[in-house]
Regions:
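Entry/N-cap segments of selected transmembrane alpha helices
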Residues: 19-21, 74-76, 82, 87, ...
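Small-residue-rich segments of transmembrane alpha-helices in multi-pass membrane proteins
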Residues: 22-27, 51-53, 76-88, 110, ...
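Helix-coil boundary and interhelical linker segments in multi-pass alpha-helical membrane proteins
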Residues: 34-36, 93-102, 185-198, 218-227, ...
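Structural signature of hydrophobic alpha-helical transmembrane segments
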Residues: 39-55, 77, 99-113, 137-140, ...
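Structural signature of multi-pass alpha-helical membrane transport proteins
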Residues: 2-74, 87-95, 241-297, 303-315, ...
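Oxyanion-binding "anion nests"
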Residues: 217-258
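Alpha-helical membrane segments and immediately flanking helix-loop junctions
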Residues: 128-176, 196-221, 295
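Cytoplasmic-side transmembrane-helix entry/capping segments in multi-pass membrane proteins
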Residues: 15-19, 68-82, 104-105, 129-140, ...
Length: 350
């Protein structure tokens, strides 16, 4: 009798199959991400989850779609938002004091200028659609794939556009892992006053993903890795105000156009800030914080798997070369423009 009751449970019938599939993909990619060779490349579970999700989605998923789609959509939407909220347990306000005013200013200037350059090049030069440009801009400016995922509910982009943006920021963020260690001796030769700690701030303020920042900083020096991670987490903290500003822009546009289409207010972004503020009080034991961090990583990985499952190769091919070209141009700006911002701020404010 219990089995019959369980099988008729709406949650089991509607959502559980898709959630289990996303959970299976997340588990596999989490294990693969721990392989030393993969970890050195900075390929985290989020990146691997969308890759495996796309492979499964374009091969064996079709016969399962009818049974799994509701759970997959739940993972892509609700679990994503919850994962972003729990991401707040990764940061504290104390990290702002660790990098100082100059570090905060560098992150703000780099983020805003990078997003502006992305919009300028993407819309004016390459004539790409606004959703793709904004997603690539968010991923390049803030925290890679996680920022792309967090921006998607605000701009309501198609899964294929999200996948293209993720692929773009992952590609050039991975290249940065190999380029930045080579850049350090060159920068030190031309600018002898630049310290390993300052180069770490440059690394954290310009490389896309947290895992990529860790990998690049670790390849240079311990002090570089430490300052890079702090600068990067401060950059992650700017995700919430970025999403709120983006939502405000869309709301203003809609009011001017008298559109009936609703704009989603990113409540999860506010909750992200609340969680970060709460985490700054250090009321929870470290074990609990680690548990919430792990749960948030699992939820985001499941959301990425769901995104991959709903992305089709035909849609990726239709995107063409322009998103990759935009990613390359923005990466160039991050290195050169971001480097210039770092030098000027550290010269006159630090």
């Amino acid at each position: 009798m219990a089995d019959i009751t369980l099988s008729k449970n709406p949650f089991v019938q509607q959502w559980l199959p898709g959630l289990l599939l996303c959970g299976l993909i997340a588990s596999v990619t989490a294990a693969v991400a721990q392989v030393p060779g993969i970890a050195r490349l900075g390929l985290g579970s989020l990146t691997l989850a969308i890759m495996l999700g796309i492979i499964v989605g374009n091969s064996v998923y079709s016969p399962l779609a009818g049974q799994c789609d509701a759970g997959v959509q739940l993972a892509k939407q609700k679990l994503l938002r919850l994962g972003v909220i729990l991401f707040g347990f990764r940061i504290t306000l104390q990290q702002i004091t660790d990098v100082g005013l100059s570090g905060l200013l560098i992150d703000v200037l780099t983020l805003s200028s990078t997003f502006f350059v992305t919009c300028l090049l993407g819309r004016r030069l390459l004539k790409l659609d606004r959703e793709t440009v904004w997603l690539i801009g968010a991923g390049s400016s803030i925290c890679g794939a996680a920022a792309v995922l967090a921006t998607e509910p605000v701009v309501k982009a198609a899964p294929s556009k999200v996948a293209v943006a993720v692929a773009t920021v992952v590609l050039f963020g991975t290249l940065a892992i190999f380029i930045y260690p080579v850049l350090w001796p060159l920068v030190h030769d031309f600018f002898p006053r630049v310290t390993l700690t300052q180069f770490g701030i440059f690394t954290g303020s310009t490389i896309h993903e947290v895992a990529q920042v860790v990998a690049a900083g670790h390849s240079i020096a311990p002090e570089t890795e430490s300052s890079a991670v702090i600068a990067k987490m401060l950059r992650v903290m700017l995700l919430a105000p970025f999403l709120l500003l983006l939502s405000g822009v869309l709301r203003r546009e809609q009011a001017e156009q008298q559109s009936a289409k609703p704009v989603t207010f990113p409540w999860f972004a506010l909750m992200f800030v609340v969680v970060a503020l709460f985490n700054s009080l250090h009321w929870l034991p470290a074990g609990w914080v680690n548990m919430f961090n792990t749960l948030g990583e699992i939820l985001l990985t499941m959301a990425m798997a769901a995104l991959g499952l709903t992305t089709r190769f035909t849609a990726l091919r239709a995107a063409g070369y322009k998103p990759v070209l935009l990613g390359a141009l923005v990466f160039g700006w991050l290195v050169l423009g971001g480097g210039t911002i770092n030098l000027l701020v550290q010269r006159f404010i630090a």
